[in-house]
Amino acid sequence: MARIICTGLGPGDPELMAVRADRLIRAASQIAYFRKAGRAGQARQIVEGMLAATVVEHAMEYPVTTELPFDSPDYNVALAGFYDAWAARLVALPGEVVVLCEGDPFFYGSFMHLYTRLQGRVEIEVVPGITGMTGCWHATGQPITWGDDVLAVLMGTQSEDDLVDHMGACDALVVMKTGRNLPRVRRALARAGRLADAWLVENGTMPGQRVRRLAEVDGADCPYFAIVLVHGKGRRPETAHPEVAP
């Protein structure tokens, strides 16, 4: 029976990976990772050059990604079957298997769906990782929250009206799953009066990183690894007498 270790890989730059994750990956005899059919897989690319020459790789290829709406019954059936099958395969493997997961495994990570299926069937360890959004707001060079700011994490797949409601009720916000949903996100930000303060970070901490004001972006689409940010402006200690400040 296998022992499953899921390692969070952080936002993309291998140097931002946890020391424990780095050590486990380099020592792994078996790894597993998610990928879209025909693609190398972002998680696999992050660990390029770190793996033992004899490592056995298990590529878990999604049966569907953006071909069907995420709320489609067919989408749910396909993904549920996919996770069921891979949970069974991982349990049946001998020895230790290191599962790679971008960001943090317990923060919107695909591994969560395996985790719930593996509990009680096999020994599991999860190694935390820096989230992708953390890397992105550091790329802007600005703190994301101050004082009592309320931070909302939204999905670009939500309806425009839902996005507007949440955007108007928080101080700082992060929008994930942008990609082809960017036009909807942009309209929602404009309706909420927050477009002027929004940033688009593409490929945060990775090669090809690009940071731009969303209002200045002409394209209707963006890469999968892109996040929209609006920074909070909350309570902070201010210098009472600026003229004598050091």
What would you call each of these model-derived segments?
Residues 27-37, 126-128, 197-202:
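Short internal beta-strands
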Residues 38-40, 65-66, 131-134, 182-183, ...:
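Short gly/pro/ser/thr-enriched loop/turn and capping motifs at secondary-structure boundaries
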